[in-house]
Every structure is written in C-alpha cells, then in structure tokens.
Amino acid sequence: MTDNAYPKLAGGAPDLPALELEVLDYWSRDDTFRASIARRDGAPEYVFYDGPPFANGLPHYGHLLTGYVKDIVPRYRTMRGYKVERRFGWDTHGLPAELEVERQLGITDKSQIEAMGIAAFNDACRASVLRYTDEWQAYVTRQARWVDFDNDYKTLDLAYMESVIWAFKQLWDKGLAYEGYRVLPYCWRDETPLSNHELRMDDDVYQSRQDPAVTVGFKVVGGQPDNGLDGAYLLVWTTTPWTLPSNLAVAVSPDITYVQVQAGDRRFVLAEARLAAYARELGEEPVVLGTYRGAELLGTRYLPPFAYFMDWPNAFQVLAGDFVTTDDGTGIVHMAPAYGEDDMVVAEAVGIAPVTPVDSKGRFDVTVADYQGQHVFDANAQIVRDLKTQSGPAAVNGPVLIRHETYEHPYPHCWRCRNPLIYRSVSSWFVRVTDFRDRMVELNQQITWYPEHVKDGQFGKWLQGARDWSISRNRYWGTPIPVWKSDDPAYPRIDVYGSLDELERDFGVRPANLHRPYIDELTRPNPDDPTGRSTMRRIPDVLDVWFDSGSMPYAQVHYPFENLDWFQGHYPGDFIVEYIGQTRGWFYTLHVLATALFDRPAFKTCVAHGIVLGFDGQKMSKSLRNYPDVTEVFDRDGSDAMRWFLMASPILRGGNLIVTEQGIRDGVRQVLLPLWNTYSFLALYAPKVGTWRVDSVHVLDRYILAKLAVLRDDLSESMEVYDIPGACEHLRQFTEALTNWYVRRSRSRFWAEDADAIDTLHTVLEVTTRLAAPLLPLITEIIWRGLTRERSVHLTDWPAPDLLPSDADLVAAMDQVRDVCSAASSLRKAKKLRVRLPLPKLIVAVENPQLLRPFVDLIGDELNVKQVELTDAIDTYGRFELTVNARVAGPRLGKDVQAAIKAVKAGDGVINPDGTLLAGPAVLTPDEYNSRLVAADPESTAALPDGAGLVVLDGTVTAELEAEGWAKDRIRELQELRKSTGLDVSDRIRVVMSVPAEREDWARTHRDLIAGEILATDFEFADLADGVAIGDGVRVSIEKT
C-alpha cells in the first residue's frame, strides 16, 4: 500500500475468519483494549457489572450471546465518551463444582467426602473450578469481546469471601437473618435443601414424571355429635404415597360442600363437586346420606392409614386449609407436615409437630420399620401393595384403597444433579425476605428493564410472591456461614462474625483461608458458660452460591474493607445482562441483597434475553448434536457473523432463538459481505485515497450522506435504549441502500474516477464503520484502518449529530423512489419479463407525486421503462381495505366490537382526520384497526409499503422493445467478456460481431448503443469462423485498441 492508495485487496470472496484473526493479533500486539480505557481517564464512568460464570465447563451459545451484549454496550458507551471498566469474574463455589469433583473422583455419597477429608475434597474443588479458565479466555477473545482478565475477581478469594460474610453479618444485625425449621425443596442425592427461586430458574427444572396416584379412605372414629360420620371413610388423593406413613391430619375447605355417600357396604366422604370423577368407584348415582359444609367437618377424628405415630399429640383430625380446591383429587387433602409447606403451616397453627421418618438420603428410618432403608420413591410400590391388600402395616387401621393410577405431571428436579426432588422439613438459615418484600417491589420501579414487560411481569410478579430465602447448604465448598453456637444447650449463645478482624479478636488467629475445614477449626470457650465446659463451634453449613454472586457489586472490590469511595461512586451499576431465567437467579439475589443492605437497587438497567435453542427447537444437547459447533462456526464464518446472527434476532427482546448454520450465513450475506464489497469496490476503482467531503451536489451523494445522518440518529436512539436488534436492523437497511442503490447507481461515476463519488463513498464508509464498530468490531476495524491508516476505529468517538448534512425531504423522496423501483421490479419478475427488456410505461400513484417529479428519469432508467407517469389518483388503481383488530379492540369495546367488524365489512367504516375509525357504534383508535392498500389488478399493480401508493406496470412488448432488449442482453455478455479477458474498465476496444440473419436488423439498429456501453471505438459486423459465442447465435472477437 502506498501513502496515497488504498490497500490492494485479494480478489474473490474475502476469508473473513482469517481477516478476523489478523485483527485479534493486532489488538494483542497493540494493546488496543487498554488504550481504549486509558484514553477515557478522567471521563464520566459507566458502570457495567459482569455476572460471573462457572469456569468448570466450556462456554456455550448462551454464554456467547450474553458475552456479545456485554461487549457491544461497553464499546458503544466508550465511544460516547465514558470510561467503562470491564472486569471479568468467576463464580467458583457451590454444588456445580462439587458434583464435577465427585464425578472425577467417583464419589457417590457425602460419607465418602467425610472419609477422604474436607480439606482434600475442597482442594480438588479449587483446582476444578479454574480448570477451563484458559479455554474461556480463548473463547472470549475469539468472539472479539474486550474484558480485563488480568484484574479478574473470584468468589473463592479471601477478600471476596470476607465481604460476603460481612453482608451476612449486616443481615443478622438488621434482624433479617434467622434460623428456622421449614419445608423446602430437598435434593436427597446432594443431601441439601434448595431455595424456592432455584426451582424457577430454568424451564427444564420441572420435567415430566410419572408417579403412582392413590385415593385412600381414612376411617372416621367418633365424628361430631349427630353428624352420622362415625365409621365413614374420608377419601384423600395423593401423588406421593410415600408420605402416607407420616400422615398427621387432613384438610378441607370450610366453604366447599361435601357429601357422605353409600357405596356397597361402605360410606365415603368427599367434595360434592368430585362425585362425577369417582363415578366408576362410587356409582353413577350414589346414594347421598348427608351433605356438609367443610366447616362442619372440622375437628372430626379419624384413623391414619398407618399406625406408626398413633400417640402423636393433636394429630389425626380434620383441619381447615385455604389451599384446598375441587380442581382435582377429592376435595380432602392428606397432610404430612414434614413434607408439605402448606401442611406445615396449618399443622403448626394447631400444635401438631411434624414427624420426620425420612433421613437425609431420602430413605425411611427405623421409626417406619416396615419400609426402613428403602428410598421413598422405591417404597411407593410396596406402600401401594400394602394398601391394596390391607396387609402388613396397612392392616392395623384398615384404610381403604379405592383407586390406584399412574399420574404424569411436571415435577421439580435438582438443577444441578437432575434427580427428582422431595419436599422435606429441614433446619435452615433464611433471609427474612418477607419483611422487605414490599420495598423490593418499590425499588424495582426504579430499574429500566428490557424487555419492558419483565419489570411488572416475570420479575415483578416473582417479587410480589417472594418468600424467605433459604441460604444455608449442608455442603463443603462455599463461603461459610459465619455463625458460632454453643455446643451445650444449657448455655445457649450465638456469635456472628462479619470480618477477619472480628474473628482474630475472638479466636486469636487471623484466618488465611475462610473455607472449610480451616474455618471450622476456630473454637473458643463459651463466654456465657460459668462452668467453662461448653465450646463455641461454627455451624457446618455454607452459604448458597447465589449469595456469593448476589454480593458481587461490593465483594469484587472488598467493600467495606477497601474502596469505600469507589463503591459509593459505582453503585448501583448502570447495566447488567443475562438470560431471562436470572429473574429467579442472579437478578433476584442482587436485588434482595441490595434492598436489604443498602435500600437501593443493585442496577439501573437490565437486559433479560431469551433462550438459545438447537436447530430442532429443543434445548441444546451435546448428545443430540442439535446445534452448530461454535469453533467450526468461528473457523468457517467468523465471530462477526455469529455476533450479527445473535444480536439481530428477537432474542434480545425476550424471544427464544433457534440456531442454524443458514441463519448465521445470512448475516454474512446481508451485511458483512456488502460492507466488505463496498470497501473493496472503492479500493479497486479509486485512483487514490479519498478525502473527507460532504459538499458534493450530486443527488445520489447528497442522498447517501443524508441517509447516513439518519442512520447515525437511529442507531444512537436504539443503542441508548439497549435495542440492539433495532440497531442491527437500521444498519442492515442502510447497508442495503448503500450497496444496492448508491453504489450500483453510481458505478459509471466510479469507472470515470469521479472525485465527488470517490470522496463521498470514502466519507460514508469512514462514518459507517464507526457507527457499526460496536456491532461488528472486527470487519469495521479492517475497513477503518484501510481507509484511514489510523490506529483503531475503537479509539474513535461516536459521530456527532452535526457531522453530516441532513436532508429529510431528499431521504423521504429517494426512499420512496427505491420503494417504487422495488415494487415494479417484483411485478416484472412475476410477469417473467427479463430486466434488460424495455417496457413501455410505469404509472406511479402516490399521495404527493410532486415529491417524485425530479426522479422520473432515474426511475425510468432503473426500471428500464420508456415512460414514467406520476398521479395522485390512488383510488383509480386500488382501494384501502379496513379490518378491525379484535384482539386489541375487544377488551375496550366489549360487545360493540362485533358491530364494528360488521360495519367495516359492509364498507361503512370512515377514517377521521385524527386517524380514528368510525365503525358502526364504535370509534376505534389507530392501533385497533388495520388499513391495507389492495391493488385493483394484482397482475399489473403492486402496493407500496405502508399503503403509500401503487405502481402499475405496462408489460406490453413491441418488436422495437424486444430489439432493444436483445441489444442490452448482448451488452451484458460483452461486458462479462471484457472482464474475463482481463481488460481494465477504462480500456477501449475493437469489436467484430457475427450475427444470425434474423437478428441483423436488430444489431445494426442498436450498433451505437452497444458500442458506447462497451467502450468500442471500432465496431463492425462480419462473418466469424471462430470468435467467442456469447448468446443467441452471436459470435464476437474483441481486442484492446
């Protein structure tokens, strides 16, 4: 490349992946990322929180998608003058890490961990969580994402963990952390509870499962005086037969009507509304012996199905439950308080303590001797058999099994090990979320959400129903809960620590590692024990890993022990992004802790994108291989192609996205190649490097510069509101106008080395690459550096509003010209009339034909028509067809919507000057109806976009037009021949043409037209024995003159 010439580019299609690798190598050598940060020193800061991923697995499409957004927004904000730090983080604790190590070591049980030693196990976890950091860095770098790996944070670091225990201590001091006994989702494989929000994070947490469902009669003993229930059976239905040995009560709704019916020699009680559901067992028209309101049944005593806990205080009575319905079952609900959240609440209110015969591994213990050692799911079959035969433990109290069926239903599974969960009462530590739930709802209103509906929808509704958060886990690899208790209940004491200083003060040693087992070794005498025999010991639990990540804003900088001023200036964050499931995960825990600790939101703006699916529409699966390999896509199409495919899709507006190879390649075809080809076109035809100019008077130059000004404004508007798909669409539309209109219509000017055209295109590409830089950072870097020879497009500012001349009228007119040409071209194609065949006439009917008057010749030339007629008589060639949008209008209009539809169909709808529609008794707003322009003659007429008008194409072909079309076909063939023989576009040539006799008149008539277009200074007709065949029997020879 000389100082005054563009780089010489290789011919043919560009190798985009290879070019991208060159850029990445340049960035690495140049340290461009750090330069982009440094040049904003002293500028206002834009605070981006990068949610930490787990590093014990390789990145997938979901990570790539989020990562692209995490790159685009900081790049854009940096160009807008902000300093944007991009510190990477690693989520390192929790069961994902533990399970990976268990797989590596062949561990299947917690007892094996205890046997090998917690220290050894946690050392293995530490090594595992950082196993893939190099691979992660390679992926992140390859996707052209700029992040600071050198200054990363890890949740396992001592400083990070100290901030986390500080947060717990703050909650304790505020009365917002407590220990309680609750029914929680419980993983028997991992032997630990889960929090409720973990069950709602991913769609596949609830999986279809078949369970035995039984309807069992519990025999009433005593009943109420004179109600006739003594000896009848209360019918209950359950899909968890394994909980029947723990039954302590049944619940009814006080307001539901119940009946006692005779069926054979037995009497059964159930909700009247459920009789039909049990017609097979009870008869089509059973004899009703009595009718009762649920309230009348309260206190009724019965015999439980199994007699293991017959002496349990206050048990085995009918209680009131507001959760009881008649949607399924019998209207009477079996309650085992240790295994049902509602059951526990109702039972506690009347003094029924739970029984817990199931151990931490999900197996029955000795208190249920007949099933001892069996896993609860395995015991279901034997329990059903015993009920069916009234044998074994079911023989004592005589329960009656009247139905046994298989019930398929969505059932929660552990999101980590994928085993089905149970609900089990456990002791756990909680954050008292219900105390500040209303405040969380209020603070959510200060957050800007994209999509907007997430605020009051998925996230807002979740906040409204938020329950206390179970934050303790009975595991090993995690931040310890900093609670020490006396080991003697006679001298109770609880100490909570929130810093290393506090631990050192009381234990005389400053921990160098807060992980187990080292933290567990810190003990001291109980200060409240005068005997001096009891000891303060740490509880064995660790914190929920979501507590770790939710602490990220302050823990990453070791707040409040360091960086107090920094934190105050960087909290809340300006922006975060993750997938929609994090409304139950990271978004949620950030919000909980921010509200509890600081009474502020943790973030100002959040993008919650949809889910990336495999090409079969299912969740991506390695075993199914239902998605393109990421590395192969990078190697074949490049990162910018992947970025464009993901960012231009509806997924950032909350929809899901199916990944296909064709979809990725479409981005190359629609945007990347057109941008590259435009740059290549300029480099090929410009005799020297263009200069910045915006003063050309040529209408096409003025148009593309004004169109670029519109792009600048549109992109700015979209990026300011994080509408990245909208920004991509604006760029795609501009690229279409640039390549398929401006460059194509200006080719002859470039061939003539027109300085206005060259300078204008140079200027347009220079600005376009800056505007596109956040969206397509690699290809824009190549083009920018080739255009300007400057260091990097990513070290430039966002184009200013007054940088380019604007001309709204010209843009509107030329855009309509393009629409006219597009519609007419579609008609020509439908009629199968080739492009080079001239046609006699095009009629353009628009509201303001004067707008198009200056462009009549351009339209005629573009469409190859002899005459263009402009008119405002739209109704001559078509009509507007009105339809009512019933889905929108219906809720407001009610029954009047049908009258409106009828009026519109009858042609009685009238559009008012204000845009409303009068239709029968109703007045519809513009969004409640649709207006579509319909052509009177669809074969020759087409509507313009948005009902702007119509075009009518006369497809009559005369002999004269056919002859001219024949000549233009030959011109195209001769141009291709020039190109294939290596002639320069400006070379003059000599042509000898041999034409069949039947075409000789056509050839001679249009000799000058042909010669002029192909730059032939000498053109003659003669018979050729050899020469090159170019079509329709024509042979030619050409040579440079």
From Swiss-Prot:
Motif 'HIGH' region per UniProt: ranges: 53-63
Positions annotated to bind ATP: K622
Superkingdom of origin: Bacteria
Predominant subcellular localization, coarse grouping: cytoplasm
GO molecular function annotation: aminoacyl-tRNA deacylase activity; ATP binding; isoleucine-tRNA ligase activity; tRNA binding; zinc ion binding
Example of a GO biological process term: isoleucyl-tRNA aminoacylation
Gene3D superfamilies: HUPs, Isoleucyl-tRNA Synthetase, Domain 1, Valyl/Leucyl/Isoleucyl-tRNA synthetase, editing domain
Enzyme class: ligase
Cofactor requirement: Zn(2+)
Single GO cellular component term: cytoplasm
Keywords, ordered alphabetically: Aminoacyl-tRNA synthetase, Antibiotic resistance, ATP-binding, Cytoplasm, Ligase, Metal-binding, Nucleotide-binding, Protein biosynthesis, Zinc
Free-text domain note: IleRS has two distinct active sites: one for aminoacylation and one for editing. The misactivated valine is translocated from the active site to the editing site, which sterically excludes the correctly activated isoleucine. The single editing site contains two valyl binding pockets, one specific for each substrate (Val-AMP or Val-tRNA(Ile)).
Known partners and oligomeric status: Monomer.
Function: Catalyzes the attachment of isoleucine to tRNA(Ile). As IleRS can inadvertently accommodate and process structurally similar amino acids such as valine, to avoid such errors it has two additional distinct tRNA(Ile)-dependent editing activities. One activity is designated as 'pretransfer' editing and involves the hydrolysis of activated Val-AMP. The other activity is designated 'posttransfer' editing and involves deacylation of mischarged Val-tRNA(Ile).
Record's protein name: Isoleucine--tRNA ligase
